[in-house]
Amino acid sequence: MKASILKAGPRGIARASRIILRGGVVAFPTETFYGLGADAGNIQALEKVFRAKGREEHKPLLLLLADRTWISGLVKEIPMVAEGLMENFWPGPLTLIFEASPHLPLLLTGGTGKVGLRISSHPVAQALVQKVGQAITGTSANLSGQPSASLVAEVFRGLGGEIDAILDGGQTAGGLGSTVLDVTGERPRIIRRGAIPGSQLASFLGKKVDFFP
């Protein structure tokens, strides 16, 4: 199998959404790097993402949403601290980690009981998730341990034989990936440094933000 290259217009986005809803995996541009989209509720599709990336199954996959109202069925609760963060930093490169709904597949959460969510500010990513009509995976479109991809050629070189399609949105901004912030504890913790600095989050929250590890 070789991935189809789809133009990131209405027709290509519609085709990509159909591929995802049929259990396929599609690479698409975000405001940082290319991501891999699959149906978050389809176990076979999730397994395909793990195989394509060579990713260890204990590592969870983050999800992309089109709207904050989609959160309710994915998490146990929405902490008050998360409300302000979503209001100010979504859409954008901030992934928030919540206590996962027990209905989510274990493969998605990596058995951690938590799930990472964000809304991308990239118009193609937004349009794709909206067209699919439900949460999709948003993990980076690269082999595990390799640099993230900001060009279609890089995605194709690493994953072209393992995924179904690539939505060609041109070169992405690159830089740093999304900042990953765990909001499940008493004090927010940055799990992964990224495009939004910890100092900016701490300033907004008016409290210290822990770093882990």
Which ranges hold each PLM region?
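Active-site-adjacent structural elements in enzyme catalytic cores
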Residues: 1-213
